[in-house]
Amino acid sequence: MDKFLIDVIVEIPKNSKIKYEYDRQTGQIRVDRILFGSESYPQNYGFIKNTLDWDGDELDCFIFADQPFLPATVVPTRIVGALEMIDDGEIDTKLLGVIDCDPRYKEINQISDLPKHRIEEILIFLKTYKLLQKKTVIIKGLKDVCWAKKEYEICLQLMKDYGHLSKDQFIQKMQILHPEHYQK
């Protein structure tokens, strides 16, 4: 399979405790909250423009890199897999990628090429970062690049078909049309 390259727009820099979130209505990145606990984001975290995931937000992506990037920075990213999870009852996919313009990452093309410890950092972060908010996050599993690409294509289509809806309208409609993606 050819490399799966996409541009990811950074919302949250590596090591930040600030939860920024892209606001599709205004096109701005807003401070959503400060993380409730002692955790910080283990890698850069962003979204893929023109996609819509089942949670009503753009498709998310962790970007493995040695440096933190400022919010709104576009990072060329090579997708190496995905993480399927349920966040507060909604499917919330996280693509996993590496910075594509850093030679230190040129040999990483799939999740198994990454140090296991780095993957564990993300898994532990996602399992614990909402505990003090009394919200549940369930990790369903790691997925390969082919799965990630299919999910990306689904999210592109969801944006084309339903991007005009508000987040609440989208979720209400999808809970009826695709209840398998929701546990509420």
From Swiss-Prot:
One of its GO terms (molecular function) is magnesium ion binding. Mg(2+) 1 binds at D55, D60, D92. Pfam families: Pyrophosphatase. It is found in: Cytoplasm. It catalyses: diphosphate + H2O = 2 phosphate + H(+). Its cofactor is Mg(2+). Its main location: cytoplasm. The keyword Heme does not apply. Homohexamer. Belongs to the PPase family. The keyword Repeat does not apply. Keywords: Cytoplasm, Hydrolase, Magnesium, Metal-binding. Coiled coil: none annotated. This is Inorganic pyrophosphatase. Catalyzes the hydrolysis of inorganic pyrophosphate (PPi) forming two phosphate ions. InterPro entries: Pyrophosphatase (IPR008162), Pyrophosphatase_sf (IPR036649). GO terms for cellular component: cytosol. GO terms for biological process: phosphate-containing compound metabolic process.
